[in-house]
């Protein structure tokens, strides 16, 4: 089967220099150094070579366009990418590139491929096995697991087991030499489409005790077109000793204000507590069980299509690519 590997940089492609590790290896060099032998019918393309902290929305556009041009030429595509923003990229690609007819698999490593104890060989082998599975969609392969790209979050900063599938089944797992498929997502059978429209003017604000409405007003004045609040637990807005709820009620008529949770699992339910119900009445849009990465990139993508707050509310609460429980 014919596979394309696209290099974006990251730890997997990094070499240690005077200023620490820096992405510099080509994706072909990464494969060779990792000792991957089962990729004889592979092509290689170096699109970027950067630390993923440097990834910007324009890089998503470049990658989505490149993927779109190649999805009908290959049986699978692997994207090597830095881990810090990998889940943002896999989520945005899921929204920009609909109904890919092949597996598109993101992977990387926590330890550079040049190091003896690198996890690059395991992750690349897992990605190659899944890229030849014929299971279409956008995925992340890491530490012997395959996860849906729009349901993946980085949860550890040092461990090889850096990513988890959030509120969604693990798609496949490596057991010995075999990749065992546990779950196949259901997607529409439509033709692959590319829709790059998005607006990156989204601000994420973490709710903490004492937070006031000033920062929300400032965000609107600075031209931000959407706000995501990382709230507590199941979600809610404080109404005691703060102008926050009143401010949000005023601003939610102008821009979408979405609430996700600081907790990793289970998502938000704004109907559960009074603080949540008051937030709903104030116009806050619940993110449901979406990851923070999916919430942010979905809002960016929707803002590229409409400014109408009511339309945005409907789309944010609609499952588009598997990011949200129906």
Curated annotation (Swiss-Prot):
Residues in the active site?
Answer: 11, 83-84, 154, 273
Region Important for activity at high temperatures, as annotated, extends over 179-182
Per the record, the GO terms for biological process are: amino acid metabolic process
Residue intervals of the Asparaginase/glutaminase domain: 1-319
CDD domains recorded? L-asparaginase_I
Which GO terms fall under molecular function for this chain's record?
asparaginase activity
Biotechnological and industrial applications of this entry: Absence of glutaminase activity, higher stability, and mesoactivity makes P.furiosus L-asparaginase and its mutants promising candidates for clinical as well as industrial usage.
InterPro entries to which the protein is assigned, alphabetical: AsnA_fam, Asp/glu_Ase-like_sf, Asparaginase/glutaminase-like, Asparaginase/glutaminase_AS2, Asparaginase_C, L-asparaginase_C, L-asparaginase_I, L-asparaginase_N
Q: Does the keyword Acetylation apply?
A: no
Q: Which domain of life is it from?
A: Archaea
Per the UniProt entry, the dependence of activity on temperature is: Optimum temperature is around 90 degrees Celsius. Thermostable. The extreme thermal stability of this enzyme is due to the presence of high intersubunit associative forces supported by extensive H-bonding and ionic interactions network.
- In its keyword annotation, does this UniProt entry include Calcium? no
What does the free-text pH dependence field read?
Answer: Optimum pH is 9.0.
Q: What does this protein do?
A: Catalyzes the hydrolysis of L-asparagine into L-aspartate and ammonia. Displays no glutaminase activity, a highly desirable therapeutic property.
UniProt record similarity statement = Belongs to the asparaginase 1 family.
Quaternary context: Homodimer. Heating induces higher order association. Forms homotetramers at 80 degrees Celsius.
**Miscellaneous remark of the record:** Microbial L-asparaginase is considered as an important biopharmaceutical drug enzyme in the treatment of childhood acute lymphoblastic leukemia (ALL). It functions by reducing the availability of circulatory L-asparagine to tumor cells. The principle behind the cytotoxic effect of L-asparaginase stems from the fact that the leukemic lymphoblastic tumor cells and other blood tumor cells are auxotrophs towards the L-asparagine and exhibit low L-asparagine synthetase (ASNS) activity for de novo synthesis of L-asparagine.
Protein name (record): L-asparaginase
